[in-house]
């Protein structure tokens, strides 16, 4: 960092750091911690049984077999439908499978009385009892079944999904109850969904009742049971194929053994290096279609699935499941699947499993209770007593969360009190940021101007000591010291920008308020501003290549700013000067256009500040010359 070349190299390193940082924090390695993996040993009966299921696709017969149903013969003509409408939800229920068949979310009022718009992009019109609602469907039109399975290969399509349940409505208490008896008449399965009009939570109670005169081993280490809670979450594009950027927005998560973990949904959770090791060692004997994570001491605290703007969480209130299943099959939609291995019922006994379930936006105001009577932290009589205190980790963005939340709050206030457009809010925010850090930015501008003034002397040094790098470095530093120039004086503003950049990325990637926000020609500030898309290119891309105008403008301002502040440099330094914009173009090409807009306007402001500094310096020199 002792000359211009080093400063340019630092800028390159910082750009690469941003690139790697974004990949690390927001597209994490899908491998999970080794200490939560189920050990494939003969002493672990659960894992042994799981291995048998994976390799054969079948399970051993148990004392309480799941329903054996000829799926192709099932006809839904007797299926009953029912709806529950709350302040936030429209939920459709079906007696076939005793499940939620569709789950819609509509605009709702936040805990502070603010309107939170959910149905912002391509909403569906849902009619219930003659009243129309605009809402977004979150189950990918496949519903949430909350049904058991004793086979891994059937976890996303349980045999119970083909059983007709009896359906009972309780309009007063906003609840729906389902009941069905196993084909062998040995037990009964009951489910009750209870909603609360003002809240974004609902309660699910599952009951298993032993009808037989003998003990019923519903779940054991030898014959585990899998409960699928929430499948893969929506919404997702229906008018085009999913891109890599789209799939990176879907994830599944769980809190196990005191540690929060998440992996990409619809893809493998097997670590990259494990896959590489298997490739080189030829270890193809282990079927990695599924993996089970367990913790015998504390169990699963909660589990769920998420999309770009929404999450769905199932939190066991009165028990701790043994583990969680991770489906590694490509494009799977299994979602969050819990593992049970210790459910034993005496004759006539009723075994209950209670869950608090949240479906909503990935924001704290979505998870906040409006009525303190329902908040378990404020009321001992809350129906959600036992709710995990770590539930907020399901939408936490890590170390950048405070920056992200602060930026979102500032943008909302600017939106509220100035121009109600988030594009202008970003520009005003960029101006405010520039004003707050004006002393540092001015120091950078002064440093650049001084280095420009030294350009002829630097050129002489470079030419004179072209073959002696050590002496060239020494003379350069002597020149800087003599003229009181700090070659790294302009680095700090760039370093400060990094957390802002990452926070802006997260803000525009998963904040519901900024979803589908237009600005000038930009249709959606949360997406790249594609103004034209090429036709599909065979063997290269099926969706074509988009032309992103704002990213090109950003690079243009970056090049102009660099040339404006450049000093005498050798060919290698010139090459670095042009490599940097290419790197930036690569980084920003698929960024949310809101982030690119912010960076572009920061460049424009920096160009303006540098021009004013240079102009004032020339004016001052002319005055001194006259004197």
Curated annotation (Swiss-Prot):
Location in or out of the cell: Cell inner membrane
Membrane topology, as annotated: Multi-pass membrane protein
Biased composition (Polar residues): 33-57
A Pfam family recorded for this sequence: 60KD_IMP
GO cellular component terms given for this protein: plasma membrane
HAMAP family: YidC_type1
Name under which the protein is recorded: Membrane protein insertase YidC
Organism annotation: Leptospira interrogans serogroup Icterohaemorrhagiae serovar copenhageni (strain Fiocruz L1-130)
Lineage: Bacteria, Pseudomonadati, Spirochaetota, Spirochaetia, Leptospirales
């Amino acid at each position: 960092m002792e000359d211009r070349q080093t400063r340019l190299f630092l800028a390159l390193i910082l750009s690469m750091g941003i690139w790697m940082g974004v990949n690390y924090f927001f597209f994490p390695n899908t491998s999970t911690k080794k200490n939560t993996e189920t050990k494939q040993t003969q002493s672990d009966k659960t894992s042994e049984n799981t291995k048998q299921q994976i390799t054969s696709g079948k399970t051993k017969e148990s004392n309480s077999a799941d329903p054996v149903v000829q799926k192709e013969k099932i006809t839904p003509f007797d299926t009953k439908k029912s709806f529950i409408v709350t302040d936030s939800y429209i939920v459709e229920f079906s007696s076939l499978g005793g499940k939620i068949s569709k789950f819609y979310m509509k605009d709702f009022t936040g805990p502070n009385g603010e309107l939170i718009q959910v149905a912002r992009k391509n909403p569906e019109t849902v009619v219930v009892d003659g009243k129309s609602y605009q809402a977004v469907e979150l189950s990918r039109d496949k519903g949430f079944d909350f049904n058991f399975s004793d086979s891994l290969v059937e976890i996303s399509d349980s045999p119970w999904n083909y059983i007709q349940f009896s359906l009972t409505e309780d309009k007063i208490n906003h609840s729906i109850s389902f009941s069905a008896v196993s084909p062998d008449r040995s037990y009964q399965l009951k489910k009750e969904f209870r909603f609360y009009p003002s809240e974004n939570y609902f309660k699910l109670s599952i009951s298993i009742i032993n009808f037989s005169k003998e003990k019923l081993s519903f779940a054991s280490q030898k014959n585990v049971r899998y409960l699928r809670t929430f499948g893969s979450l929506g919404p997702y594009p229906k008018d085009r194929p999913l891109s890599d950027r789209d799939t990176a927005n879907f994830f599944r998560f769980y809190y196990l053994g005191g540690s929060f973990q998440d992996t990409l949904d619809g893809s493998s959770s097997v670590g990259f290096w494990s896959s590489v090791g298997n490739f080189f060692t030829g270890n193809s004997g282990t079927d990695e279609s599924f993996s089970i994570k367990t913790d015998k001491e504390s169990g699963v605290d909660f589990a769920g699935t998420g999309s770009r703007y929404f999450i769905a969480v199932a939190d066991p209130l009165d028990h701790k499941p043994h583990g969680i299943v991770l489906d590694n099959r490509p494009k799977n939609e299994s979602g969050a699947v819990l593992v049970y291995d210790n459910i034993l019922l005496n004759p006539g006994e009723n075994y209950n499993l209670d869950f608090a379930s949240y479906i909503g936006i990935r924001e704290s105001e979505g998870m906040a209770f409006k009525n303190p009577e329902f908040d378990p932290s404020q009321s001992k009589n809350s129906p959600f007593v036992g709710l995990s205190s770590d539930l907020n980790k399901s939408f936490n963005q890590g170390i950048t969360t405070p920056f992200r939340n602060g930026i979102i709050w500032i943008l909302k206030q600017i939106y509220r009190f100035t121009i109600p457009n988030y594009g202008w809010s970003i520009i005003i925010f960029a101006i405010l940021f520039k004003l707050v850090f004006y002393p540092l930015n001015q120091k950078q501008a002064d440093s650049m101007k001084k280095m420009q003034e030294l350009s002829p002397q630097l050129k002489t040094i470079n030419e004179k000591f072209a073959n002696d790098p050590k002496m060239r470095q020494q003379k350069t530093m002597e020149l800087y010291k003599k003229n009181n120039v700090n070659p790294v004086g302009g680095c700090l503003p760039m370093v400060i920008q990094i957390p802002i950049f990452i926070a802006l990325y997260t803000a525009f990637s998963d904040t519901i308020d900024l979803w589908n926000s237009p600005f000038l020609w930009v249709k959606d500030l949360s997406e790249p501003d594609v103004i034209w898309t090429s036709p599909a290119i065979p063997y290269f891309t099926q969706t074509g290549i988009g032309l992103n105008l704002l990213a090109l403008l950003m690079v243009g301002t970056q090049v102009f700013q660099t040339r404006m502040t450049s000093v005498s440099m050798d060919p290698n330094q010139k090459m670095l000067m042009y490599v940097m914009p290419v790197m930036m173009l690569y980084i920003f090409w698929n960024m949310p256009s809101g982030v690119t807009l912010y960076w572009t306007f920061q460049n424009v402001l920096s160009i303006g500040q540098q021009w004013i500094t240079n102009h004032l310096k020339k004016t001052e020199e002319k005055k001194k010359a006259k004197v």
